[in-house]
């Protein structure tokens, strides 16, 4: 039986529906460790009309930890918005680290740019204003085997995640990680039907149901679906 939108709160972009527990995690563990420029960017973005697209602070710390454990140096980011996850990545990379960041809307990126500059990490970022698929196709033609990427983070148009995956699994090195954000989509992916969603939300929900099934069966990667934020699926390339 499908769940109703009335049964589960979609107010917060977080799989954790206990507001008290989420507040505890953020205030006890996440905010005290949040870089001052990330805090500033978060506070500005929270006032934006599309603030629900903001990566939560606890997820940001998770991404930072993963990048450091991997000793990642070359990364790709598809979907930037105001740049919270991008700044998180730039802060986690070594001084000579490089990020290829792709988004169709540079004006959102420019909201976060002053915070990136104040953090002293702008030199690590190559921002490309474009649809992602043509850029990825060009990168596939130009990237040599020894220059493959360590890590990719995708938080963009949901219906294209599977298309991005086919490119990224070739651009990221064996042993590298590809992360897909929002793969639990407010928890709605658990149900064959979820009445009451806006049509665009429903398209995304169905895309994630298909993607989750596809990734679970893809022999090229091993996966872990992490219930942080709105769900993050980590794919480690095997071959």
Swiss-Prot record:
Record's keyword terms, sorted: Alkaloid metabolism, Metal-binding, Methyltransferase, S-adenosyl-L-methionine, Transferase
Cofactor(s) listed: Mg(2+)
Enzyme Commission no: 2.1.1.336
Catalysed conversion reaction: norbelladine + S-adenosyl-L-methionine = 4'-O-methylnorbelladine + S-adenosyl-L-homocysteine + H(+)
Pathway: Alkaloid biosynthesis
Binding positions (a divalent metal cation): 155, 181-182
Gene Ontology MF annotations: metal ion binding; O-methyltransferase activity; S-adenosylmethionine-dependent methyltransferase activity
Biological processes, Gene Ontology terms: alkaloid metabolic process; methylation
Top EC class of this enzyme: transferase
Pfam families hit by this protein: Methyltransf_3 (PF01596)
The keyword Transferase belongs to this UniProt entry's keyword annotation: yes
Keyword set includes Metal-binding: yes
Binding-site residues, S-adenosyl-L-methionine: 55, 77, 79-80, 85, 103, 132, 157
Cited function: 4'-O-methyltransferase converting norbelladine to 4'-O-methylnorbelladine. 4'-O-methylnorbelladine is a precursor to all Amaryllidaceae alkaloids such as galanthamine, lycorine and haemanthamine, and including haemanthamine- and crinamine-type alkaloids, promising anticancer agents.
Family assignment from sequence similarity: Belongs to the class I-like SAM-binding methyltransferase superfamily. Cation-dependent O-methyltransferase family.
Protein name, entry field: Norbelladine 4'-O-methyltransferase 2
Annotated source species: Narcissus aff. pseudonarcissus MK-2014
């Amino acid at each position: 039986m499908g769940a109703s939108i009335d049964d589960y709160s979609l107010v917060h972009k977080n799989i954790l529906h206990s507001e008290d527990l989420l507040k505890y995690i953020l205030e006890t563990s996440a905010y005290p460790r949040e870089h001052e420029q990330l805090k500033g960017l978060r506070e500005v973005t929270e006032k934006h009309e599309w603030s629900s697209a903001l990566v939560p602070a606890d997820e940001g710390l998770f991404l930072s930890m993963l990048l450091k454990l991997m000793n990642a140096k070359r990364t790709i980011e598809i979907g930037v918005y105001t740049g919270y996850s991008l700044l998180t990545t730039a802060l986690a990379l070594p001084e000579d680290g490089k990020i290829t960041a792709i988004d169709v809307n540079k004006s959102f990126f420019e909201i976060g740019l002053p915070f990136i500059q104040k953090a002293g990490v702008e030199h690590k970022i190559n921002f490309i204003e474009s649809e992602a698929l043509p850029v990825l196709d060009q990168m596939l033609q130009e990237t040599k085997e020894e220059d493959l990427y360590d890590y990719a983070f995708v938080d963009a148009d949901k219906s294209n995640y599977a298309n991005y995956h086919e490119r990224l699994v070739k651009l990221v090195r064996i042993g590298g990680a590809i992360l897909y954000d929002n793969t639990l989509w407010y928890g709605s992916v658990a149900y064959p039907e979820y009445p009451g969603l806006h049509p665009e939300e429903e398209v995304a929900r169905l895309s994630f149901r298909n993607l989750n099934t596809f990734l679970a069966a893809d022999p090229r990667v091993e996966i872990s679906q992490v219930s942080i934020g709105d769900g993050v699926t980590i794919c480690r390339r095997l071959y």
